[in-house]
Swiss-Prot record:
Acts as a cyclin-like protein and plays a role in the modulation of host cell cycle. May promote G2/S arrest by interacting with host mus209/PCNA, cdc2 and cdk6. The cell cycle arrest is characterized by an intact nuclear envelope, concomitant with sustained activity of host cdc2. However, viral DNA replication still occurs in the arrested cells. Belongs to the baculoviridae E27 family. Keywords: Host-virus interaction, Membrane, Modulation of host cell cycle by viral cyclin-like protein, Modulation of host cell cycle by virus, Viral envelope protein, Virion. This is Occlusion-derived virus envelope protein E27. The gene is E27. GO terms for biological process: symbiont-mediated perturbation of host cell cycle progression.
């Protein structure tokens, strides 16, 4: 290729001030819409990431059956306790980001009858001779995971009846056979060498994991009140969930915004009629970011 010499040319750009201004109008609504869409996408990503971490954690338990089948099996109390305990530990770590260990002194009771359950509270906590006791309402969890609507449970919103039922439920659950958390913890052999390159899961199965995680998160909020504010405040929170916003706020060591329940905000129209003595109006109990 033949080279051609060219004379060097110097260009000069002059900036001259002018009294004339360029007029440009912006549609703020468009920017607001884009900003909102970006925030929603980011929140959705965080929810998917949290659910993926939860499912990956449960895969280390070497479960012998799918999640729904484990809770359908009445005799498989060991795996039921393992799933619930591991889920509580997972939530505890997200609620306390700097804490890596959860309590290992916990006994589990898997209940089957209505007299040992409270509607809307499939997981309850109490103490039995100084040992923390976790009561798991297996039939209720099965209905939640299989998306069955319970139309037979009797729900009475009178405070006196609620308190009596709570007392009877705790009394009945203490008489059941218990499973200690260390019974399965010592035998658990996490498998971290799984090849997940071809791993796939259906939307129905993912919904079951999400439902269980939200259910146990709800129970963990009660557990936090039980451990930090005592039995009286815990029993009170079972009938008045407005205590969540009063006692569960983010601090230097706790992050309620890490819980999936903090991503939801909803109202129930007839809530004021049901509980006129509530501190808050509406049912915005899961909005921790006030």
């Amino acid at each position: 290729m033949k080279r051609i010499k060219c004379n060097k040319v110097r260009t000069v750009t002059e900036i001259v001030n002018s009294d004339e201004k360029i007029q440009k109008t912006y549609e703020l609504a468009e920017f607001d819409l884009k900003n909102l869409s970006s925030l929603e996408s980011y929140e959705t990503l965080k929810i998917k990431l949290a659910l993926s971490k939860y499912m990956a954690m449960l895969s280390t338990l070497e479960m012998t059956q799918p999640l729904l089948e484990i809770f359908r099996n009445k005799a498989d109390t060991r795996q039921i306790a393992a799933v619930v305990f591991s889920t509580l530990a997972f939530i505890h770590n997200r609620f306390h980001p700097l804490v890596t260990n959860f309590t290992n002194k916990m006994e589990f009771v898997v209940t089957e009858t209505n007299d040992t359950s409270i509607p809307g509270e499939p997981i309850l906590f109490t103490e039995n001779e100084g040992v923390l006791l976790c009561s798991v309402d297996r039939p209720s969890i099965v209905k939640m995971l299989s998306r069955e609507f319970d139309t037979e449970a009797l729900v009475n919103f009178e405070n006196d009846n609620c308190n009596v039922r709570i007392a009877k439920t705790f009394g009945a659950s203490k008489r059941k056979n218990t499973t200690r958390s260390d019974d399965y913890e010592s035998n658990k052999q996490p498998n971290y060498d799984m090849d997940l390159s071809d791993f796939s899961i259906t939307e129905v199965e993912a919904t079951q994991y999400l439902t269980l995680l939200l259910t146990v998160e709800h129970a963990y909020l009660h557990y936090y009140i039980f451990k930090n504010y005592g039995v009286f405040e815990y029993c009170k929170s079972l009938t008045d969930h407005s205590l969540f916003t009063n006692k569960l706020r983010s601090t230097m060591s706790t992050k309620t915004s890490n819980l999936l329940l903090s991503k939801f905000k909803f109202t129930i129209e007839d809530f004021d009629k049901i509980n006129s003595n509530s501190v808050t109006s509406g049912f915005n109990i899961y909005n921790f970011n006030k």
